[in-house]
């Protein structure tokens, strides 16, 4: 059993909209997963929600705009040192509207247990790729 996980020895997932650096796979935990999100200037994942997941973000570098709600009507400025909580089933997105990369740690918690239909991070990424018509093999990379 692992107790310590490195943020520098990660598996990288380069989506068309952002990068995720996997630190702790959900398969190695009871109800959590951890990854670093990197947004280059102009990048933003699409507005989305997770019905079965609460997310906590810790902003490490850069400033970004957090948008909340189905119409992304609520706007918040986030900066290094800020902690963001996204309750389950909440529409959200973080957009890098600046000139330098944004990095934040995401800790995902699954109330009760991790999703049975996506027991690993790779399973989750495959589902995202299928929904977006992205190629999984081109997204998963070593760091």
What positions do the PLM features span?
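A generic "binding-loop/recognition-motif" signal
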Residues: 19, 43, 52-53, 71, ...
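Short histidine-centered beta-strand/loop micro-motifs
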Residues: 24-26, 46-51, 68, 75-77, ...
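Histidine-centered metal-chelating micro-motifs
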Residues: 44-46, 65, 84, 88-94
């Amino acid at each position: 059993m692992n107790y310590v996980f490195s943020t520098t020895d990660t598996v990288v997932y380069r989506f068309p909209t952002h990068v995720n650096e996997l630190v702790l796979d959900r398969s190695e935990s009871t109800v959590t997963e951890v990854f670093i999100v990197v947004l280059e200037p102009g990048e933003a994942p699409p507005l989305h929600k997770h019905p079965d997941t609460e997310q906590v973000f810790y902003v490490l570098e850069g400033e970004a705009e957090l948008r909340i709600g189905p119409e992304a009507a609520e706007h918040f400025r986030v900066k290094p040192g800020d902690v963001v909580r996204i309750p389950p089933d909440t529409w959200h997105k973080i957009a890098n509207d600046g000139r330098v990369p944004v990095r934040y740690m995401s800790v995902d918690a699954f109330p009760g247990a991790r999703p049975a239909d996506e027991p690993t991070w790779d399973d989750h990424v495959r589902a995202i790729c299928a929904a977006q018509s992205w190629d999984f093999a081109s997204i998963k990379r070593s760091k």
